[in-house]
Amino acid sequence: MVCIQCEQTVQTPTAKGCSYTQGMCGKTADVSDLQDVLVFNLQGVSFWAELGRKYNIIDAEIDAWAPRAFFSTLTNVNFVPERITEYTEIAERYKIQLSTQVMAAAAAAGEALPELSPAAQFVLPATAEEIMNFAPEAAVNRGHEELHEDIIGLRLLCLYGLKGAAAYMEHANVLGQSEESICAEYHQIMAFLGTDPTDANALLETSMQIGLLNYRIMEILDRGETNTFGHPQPTQVNVKPVAGKCILVSGHDLHDLEKILQQTEGKGINVYTNGEMLPAHGYPELNKYPHLVGNFGSAWQNQQKEFANFPGAIVMTSNCLINPNVGQYADRLFTRSIVGWPGVVHIEGDDFSQVIECALAQEGIAHTEIEHMITVGFGRNALMAAAPAVINEVKAGNIKHFFLIGGCDGDKEERSYFTDIAVSAPEDSVILTLACGKYRFNKKEFGDINGIPRLLDVGQCNDTYSAIQLVLALAEEFDCGVNELPLSIVLSWFEQKAIVVLLTLFALGIKGIYTGPTAPAFLTDNLIKALQENFDMRSVGDVETDLATMLAGK
């Protein structure tokens, strides 16, 4: 087992990354090794998918499936070895299908095949034992004995960035959004990584390519969400319990939430969002359901306590899932799509009757607590509609600084930095926030500036796209570059979606971003220095010192 993809991975003076029997996330060594074999086989699929395009061999089914399977290896998604093995076997079938078609097309054209990558040549062993024996050859740090650590680090930066982009591709695909050019570029990058590249410049260029690709993916995901559910509108959300039978929906999948709302109409069941599902309340086509009564709980790392205290059924639609046996609620938990935990019921299709039956069988919430309302729904349209008023306040000198504070949350004490920055921001500043990092401060009162709320909840992590649109509009209005705006970006990271968002910001030329609470363990000192030199990437430090630097525009 070698896994170094998330912020909580083991870091000691002598070693970096989870190894031995279990990762910090709870996945076993066997699951980790199986994920490595799956990713390796997916690189082989992409080799043939990319080459196939030369002969007009394009399979939409494979284009949709490949990033979905890749998503299953993201942190806190799937812990079931049988499911990972099944994905690997499907990848093998697709690889054989594509390679057979491509070789026939090349032969018909009288053309020789290019050199095959190791992943393209790989033949999946027939037995589980043989697959596990092969796993070290598919390890994410393969070749580390001979290669400079910077090359391994760059490979991982690209691999983990592309994994985050693949997750957003799947979210978009669920909503009917896909573009052939995006799929083609995904396969091209995945195939390149399957060649075990050693050119540092090529890898750096690829990391920026991934960032720009993800910008396009976030754009079509935004289109899918707004076309399906309407444009988010500023909406108040109750964060206190309401008496009654109940279902909690966590993850990121708005489609699943809609299906649950439709199937629970008239059944006396209240539906709550959790984690990254909080922004759902801002979408008109979801908020129209009166039994979507509020948000329960906070960020993913608190779920073992919060889910244990939730007296109803729980649906995990995507990341982030952690061990449900700790809080003894596995019998009330249901997984969807690429998510899985051993022994937990997994739901295929759109029939949530098992969830409904479970909810009705539970005690439900006994008492309604006094409401506590927070505001969400400052998506792209809402932000752009507010832009003229914001610009007027800037010109009048009433708004002097903007902060974008958000990203993935986690349980390290150092993450209090993000709370402290938000509450310490001067009253003539506006804070944009997104992703589950917002839970650090989104229940606090920030007031407003002449009717403009000082705290604007932009949405999920992928809604970075919306924040970028506002930033670009401000830069155009004030005839300056983004980096000349009175804007400070402070991002907390935990997993691969945050990595690709960071690559997107870098690829768009945005500099001076503060990141933390720690640097990714897969980045070497040399790579961190390179990111600092090229993008002015900054590590979070002392709140007072950092805030003074931000406000001074340095």
From Swiss-Prot:
Domain of life, source organism: Bacteria
Q: Which UniProt keywords apply?
A: 2Fe-2S, Cytoplasm, Iron, Iron-sulfur, Metal-binding, Oxidoreductase
Which GO molecular function entries does the Swiss-Prot or TrEMBL record give?
A: 2 iron, 2 sulfur cluster binding; hydroxylamine reductase activity; metal ion binding; peroxidase activity
**Which cysteines are cross-linked by disulfides?**
none
Which cofactor does the UniProt annotation name? [2Fe-2S] cluster; hybrid [4Fe-2O-2S] cluster
Q: Which Gene3D superfamilies match?
A: 1.20.1270.20, 3.40.50.2030
| Catalysed transformations (reactions) | A + NH4(+) + H2O = hydroxylamine + AH2 + H(+)
- For [2Fe-2S] cluster, which residues are the binding ones? C3, C6, C18, C25
Q: Name one GO cellular component term.
A: cytoplasm
Q: For this protein, what is the EC number?
A: 1.7.99.1
Cofactor info, note text: Binds 1 [2Fe-2S] cluster.
Q: Which residues cross the membrane?
A: none
Cysteine persulfide: modified positions: C408
The UniProt record lists the keyword Transmembrane: no
Q: Does the keyword Transferase apply?
A: no
Q: Describe the task this protein carries out.
A: Catalyzes the reduction of hydroxylamine to form NH(3) and H(2)O.
What's the name of the protein? Hydroxylamine reductase
The gene for this chain is: hcp
